[in-house]
């Protein structure tokens, strides 16, 4: 189970008292998280999620709180930070920054179809449209420079076939980092995977886990999303799902010619980002009772993205 900081009931009760949400009925750790400690918390006046932030600089947390407030006010189904009776949103518990948020209804869709992908494309387009006019600036702590540094560190320990796949991808990232093309920007979720979306029946009911959110190219966020939601088990893209997601997104925000040009490379960049972070996590948490996602999943996807046949609607 991915709970890095266990909690005693009495400690949690004292923490929850200032929210005036009634007595604590029950709480349990959430196994799905891989970076923070998350708990389902059942109180007299509702169901909530408590997050203890285990990774990242504390100074970034006000950014996440403000971004979620902006998205909530624009009608997106996101978990915003609740305030105590004194107006505090960001607090500390067991020495860690802590946030209490409403628990959203729904479940994760492990085997999405074209309808689910259409809903996700519309959601991502809404998120970008809500923030592109007034971007809350925060560079990603796992952006292009991070990929170049970590890729160089990890490459010597990889098998020859993996190194041969990674090397040209890192060269492509270096070129992109040097060019910094003028692609349209907004705030990004930057981790919009299946386990961060909730469906209530056929309807998308929630988008969670914003702790990788940042500002940047919208195309990169779209590539991250499509790589997870529209990939087959062999790493290839499913055309029906991919086109449904892209069409729904484009209804919210049309693509530019420059985005169409950079689309294939952005899909590869998005693969590298998660291949590297999963390799790092697999080394760091080896032998521990922590959820570790398989790095090979993105190695396979990167291999499949050497030829991209699913183009943006602009380029059809």
UniProtKB/Swiss-Prot annotation:
What is a single molecular function from GO for this protein?
Answer: homoserine kinase activity
User: Which EC number(s) does UniProt give?
Assistant: 2.7.1.39
A Pfam family it matches? APH
Reactions mediated catalytically: L-homoserine + ATP = O-phospho-L-homoserine + ADP + H(+)
For the protein in the UniProt heading, the enzyme class is transferase
Kindly list the biological process annotations in GO that this record carries: threonine biosynthetic process
Q: What is this protein called?
A: Homoserine kinase
Cited HAMAP family: Homoser_kinase_2
From the UniProt record, give the pathway where this protein acts.
Answer: Amino-acid biosynthesis; L-threonine biosynthesis; L-threonine from L-aspartate: step 4/5
Record-linked SUPFAM superfamilies:
Protein kinase-like (PK-like)
Q: Which UniProt keywords apply?
A: Amino-acid biosynthesis, ATP-binding, Kinase, Nucleotide-binding, Threonine biosynthesis, Transferase
- Family the entry assigns: Belongs to the pseudomonas-type ThrB family.
Inactivation phenotype: Cells lacking thrB are still able to grow in a minimal medium without the addition of threonine.
Tell whether NADP is among the UniProt keywords.
no
State the PANTHER family in the record: AMINOGLYCOSIDE PHOSPHOTRANSFERASE DOMAIN-CONTAINING PROTEIN (PTHR21064:SF6), AMINOGLYCOSIDE PHOSPHOTRANSFERASE DOMAIN-CONTAINING PROTEIN-RELATED (PTHR21064)
Q: Which Gene3D superfamilies match?
A: 3.90.1200.10, Phosphorylase Kinase, domain 1 (3.30.200.20)
Membrane-spanning parts: none
